A protein has these predicted regions:
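Preference for long, amphipathic alpha-helical scaffolds in soluble/luminal domains
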Residues: 1-216
């Protein structure tokens, strides 16, 4: 137990502390070299590193860039190739918006560019941040796009005229005690994403309440 038995009656959240301790123990196990999880992790990274990376694509695109960059496994040559091909794709698209229907395209690319230390405000002469300057456009794809847009802006402390609206929208559009991609039941995946997006603003009372609700 995280709290000695003699002190448990003095601690109101001992159960929560116990659960957190158990989860940290699981994380420590995963991080140990030689465990199956670590082996799988290394295998996946190796596969991603060997495969081609294509710009403005979900699978085999930006998520690969982000994963490899964060793991320190993205070679300079592969990073440069991705960036150059992305610039060509943005130029060919001819707009700050990478998709008429999916604002998550802009958000995902911005996150990937931040992992490379690149400025999304000028990619082949186009401002990918401006592609997310309209709440109607962002919300047309649902709460998922709102969450990823906020995360994207915060990857490099970008300023955005939709910033406060994004935070408010996430807080005001909870499903039960969390968030859901669809339906009336909160799901773990989207709730975790929402909490990640809101975490930098936990000092705000309303945001903090939403975060703690999701954690429950």
């Amino acid at each position: 137990s995280a709290v000695p038995e003699r002190l448990r009656d003095k601690v109101t959240n001992s159960d929560t502390l116990d659960k957190a301790t158990e989860r940290f123990a699981v994380i420590d196990t995963i991080k140990q070299a030689g465990t199956k999880s670590k082996d799988h992790f290394d295998t996946v990274l190796g596969t991603l590193a060997d495969n081609n990376i294509y710009p403005v694509q979900s699978i085999g695109g930006e998520w690969s860039v982000i994963a490899l960059a964060r793991a320190g496994k993205l070679s300079a040559d592969k990073a440069a190739k991705y960036y150059n091909e992305l610039c060509e794709a943005v130029k060919a698209n001819g707009s700050d918006r990478l998709s008429d229907r999916k604002p998550t395209e802009n958000a995902r690319v911005i996150i990937a560019l931040s992992s490379l230390g690149k400025n999304s405000a000028d990619i082949a002469g186009y401002n990918l941040l401006s592609g997310l300057d309209d709440m109607d456009y962002i919300t047309s794809q649902g709460i998922n796009a709102v969450i990823f847009s906020l995360i994207a802006f915060d990857t490099t402390d970008y300023s955005a005229n939709t910033h406060d609206e994004l935070i408010a929208y996430i807080v005001d559009n909870m499903t039960g005690k969390g968030w859901a991609l669809a339906g009336d039941t909160a799901d773990v995946d989207l709730t975790a994403m929402a909490i990640q997006a809101l975490a930098p603003y936990a000092a705000d009372e309303k945001v903090n309440a939403a975060i703690h609700s999701g954690l429950e």
